[in-house]
Amino acid sequence: MGVTQRQLMDAYIRQKRASPGMVQASDLQMSRPMSGMRSNSRELHGYDGPMQFIGSPHNPDQILSNNSTTGVHLTSSLNSSRNNSNNLRSLSTINQEDLIEEISSHELEDDESSPVTVVEQPIQPQSANSMQSQRLRSGQQSFNEPLDEDDYANRNISGVAAVRPANIASPYKDSAAVEGSNGTANGSGSIGGNGESEGDVIGNIDQFVMQPAPQGVLYKCRITRDRKGMDRGLFPIYYLHLERDYGKKIFLLGGRKRKKSKTSNYIVSCDPTDLSRNADGFCGKLRSNVFGTSFTVFDSGNKESTENPRLDLAVIIYDTNILGFKGPRNMTVILPGMTEDDQRVKISSADPKQQGILDLWKMKNMDNIVELHNKTPVWNDETQSYVLNFHGRVTQASVKNFQLVHDSDPEYIVMQFGRTSEDVFTMDYRYPLCAMQAFAIALSSFDGKIACE
């Protein structure tokens, strides 16, 4: 039986999962201590040269001269050779163009990126303080975990490391306490800080997803990836839900990648049954440049209209690394500034009378924009990976794991995103982001990129 394209990709993913270099969360315990792996107590045998025929009878690497045993090995080797030969013939019959299209269309992790690992770190509690509009805080994460399929699609990103949840002591003396059994934390900077309530939907969904989060409110969300969509799963659909108590959830947004587009173009809608630009629930779109290194988020306005002009909601920029140094992914997010009544400044790149967010940032005109960066993961010698503390919200390493902070207050986490299973990701956000902005930022991390990081 011939080898299918899906089997080829599955084999590639399994191979990648065996290799180190992902970012992991620092809040995960290791399955066994590293010291046990360094034990020298057992005898190792590895000689496979021609003299093993006369080796010690106690050597497990010795080849016995028993004819029947030799015949069994020979038959097994011949059968294996025939199977390999048949597989090669099957591979040659696969349409190369279909294979290239399928592999390039999948969202995968790049070879040279390091995933971020997740490790929970003990953090000292901090006295409750009022939320400040420009305050930003974060935790720690690491890079040594398996690649999922969209990680594999990003294999062309040069020099990106995965992030793992980490379990190391916090480098910040005033960091917030890790969230307790009730799902809340005791610090204002960490996810679920003291005096910070978990947000709920207020009013209509289409209005709520565009409204900036109030100060002092945290929204805990979950993104699920549905691969059962069009074109053999090459264009999955992403669903954003707000998590509630007792496992309940509220649908907020859905997003899908447009098929016939020169660059990556995602449609975002609050109607899960109609993810099109003409739908009543259309909320906006995410569009990338040709390299997939820069993304712009727009609302549902019309760029040709003067009454309802299309507004810029965010710009996401992934740093390029043409030298290919291996390390965590670096990203910059530029948002419209906030007014005194906590509303976004209206910026439209479609208006010839004003500059868009990206143009303002390039000219270093920061009066009406806010610049965020991903929290830099910390290298952990014990796990040999980059780690960040996601406070229990992220459980698997991935290049896509990240936390967004502001340079003026790197303890205040504006948004965090990370993988918990093959097709499930957590996404938490707070002021000044809205659900639409946060979801679009998360979608940009799924997309394949060339020469990034």
Swiss-Prot record:
Biased composition annotated in UniProt, kind: Low complexity: 74-90, 179-188
Phosphoserine modification, residue list: S142
Presence of keyword Transcription regulation: no
Main location: cytoplasm
Region Disordered: start-end pairs: 19-39, 58-90, 125-148, 175-194
Membrane topology: Peripheral membrane protein
GO (cellular component) term, any one: rhabdomere
Ranges of compositional bias, category Polar residues: 62-73, 125-144
InterPro entries with a match to the protein in the record: Tubby-like_C (IPR025659), Tubby_C (IPR000007), Tubby_C_CS (IPR018066)
One Pfam family it belongs to: Tub
Subcellular location: Cytoplasm; Nucleus; Cell projection, Cilium membrane; Cell projection, Rhabdomere
Key words, A-Z: Cell membrane, Cell projection, Cytoplasm, Membrane, Nucleus, Phosphoprotein
Gene Ontology biological process: protein localization to cilium
Transmembrane parts of this sequence: none
Keyword Cell membrane: yes
PANTHER family: PROTEIN KING TUBBY, TUBBY-RELATED
Family note: Belongs to the TUB family.
Protein name: Protein king tubby
Species for this entry: Drosophila mojavensis
Biological classification of the source: Eukaryota, Metazoa, Ecdysozoa, Arthropoda, Hexapoda
